[in-house]
Amino acid sequence: MLNKQTLISIEDALPGREQPMQIEDCHFVNQSSLTAPLAHHQQQILLGMGCFWGAERLFWQLDGVVSTSVGYAGGFTPNPTYEEVCTGKTGHTEVVRVVFDERVISLAQLLAVFWEKHDPTQGMRQGNDLGTQYRSAIYTYSQDQQEIADKSKLQYQQALEAELRSTITTEIVPAGPYYFAETYHQQYLAKNPDGYCGIGGTGVCFPPSLQG
């Protein structure tokens, strides 16, 4: 019997499919392209912080964020469906892909929001959402991003320890494939303002002097 709090092995993961998910390319909120190549002053990062509906809304509201989308990453099954991810048999976590203008907002500033707005100490869950798909994760696209993310984790761990909180369980590794979620998930809380939002932090602030 599958334990949804234990990551599945690649041997036991669902096979998936070759055909990518077909999505509407236009961002529902700011009309940006979800699939456009990065400009020279832009970066991307994948952030997992529980249910991706509420997480995405946090980031599209920030100055300097060019575009956001939601999808699946960190697992084994190619081009999974939401229903497959929910079984725990793909290895993926729900993530937000954030494309940002590094001239306006830094990765360190984005990560301060990431750390503060969810509980990164809960392992394979986030609040009432239970399963490996809700694990906390940062998937990076360069060595510089990896170093910034690792450093910010240490800084936030120190802030948590000062408040006698638990140990961070966030997975921080180089990004593998990113698979778009279905169109109805994209900018979900803009389309459904009264929809479910599971976002909730620890109440511990990231030290302002360290946000870069």
Swiss-Prot record:
It is an enzyme of class 1 (oxidoreductase). SUPFAM superfamilies: Peptide methionine sulfoxide reductase (SSF55068). It catalyses: L-methionyl-[protein] + [thioredoxin]-disulfide + H2O = L-methionyl-(S)-S-oxide-[protein] + [thioredoxin]-dithiol; [thioredoxin]-disulfide + L-methionine + H2O = L-methionine (S)-S-oxide + [thioredoxin]-dithiol. The active site is at residue 51. One of its GO terms (molecular function) is L-methionine-(S)-S-oxide reductase activity. GO terms for cellular component: cytoplasm. This is Peptide methionine sulfoxide reductase MsrA. It comes from Vibrio parahaemolyticus serotype O3:K6 (strain RIMD 2210633).
